[in-house]
Amino acid sequence: GSKLWFNCNPDSSEHWFFKEWIDENSEKTAEKNRLHLHFTMDDNFSLSDEVKQRYDRMYSGVFYQRYIQGLWVLAEGLVYGAVFDKSRHIVKNYTPSNQAFYYISIDYGTLNPCSMGLWALEHGKAVRIKEYYYDGRRKNIQKTDEEYYSELEKLADGYNIQHVIVDPSASSFITTIKRHNKFRVRKANNSVIDGIRNTMTLIENDRIFICECCKDIIREFSLYRWDEKSI
């Protein structure tokens, strides 16, 4: 008879493929005449130790369990709880050098909070040195694009901004920024999973730091939880 071969990276333990083909406790799995082989990078003899170490550093948290250890695990609990260490990643009295490049990231929200961060990049590290945060839902007053643009200019005052990086879904706000012709706009990668994975890796490798004055992003890092139904 015919045979099926599958080769895949693990995902959530709630994934249909895991439940139907891999989970030893699943009735659907028990019905199949199948062989499950679990392997990791160490089983690939074509990879050098240097390459394996590089891949090993690329992931952390649940992504390390999935992509390096080959485990089908559920993303649960705090997103950055395992990697964000306040004693290590929060800095005091940080003064960027003359070689620093400056960027502003914007998580634009109408119903959700609007968060803007001024970042200093140097020596392969990014430090959030100032921020603007506004929660229209909590204050019961929504701001216009022009009002948010005014806050952007205040945040950028005194700095040579390379790019303003904005959520691409904030099309009206991007139009407002471009109309003023002061900042160069770069649209952010809107993939939630890629963004979380990259941020976790940068934090784990001590390449992202937060100044203690940026209390809102520090609070968000401490509260941000996985949506177990979607991840």
Give names to the regions the model predicted.
Residues 1-58:
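ASCE P-loop NTPase helicase motor core
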Residues 37-39, 68, 188:
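Hydrophobic residues at beta-strand termini and immediately following loops
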Residues 44-106:
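ATPase catalytic-site recognition across NTP-hydrolyzing enzymes
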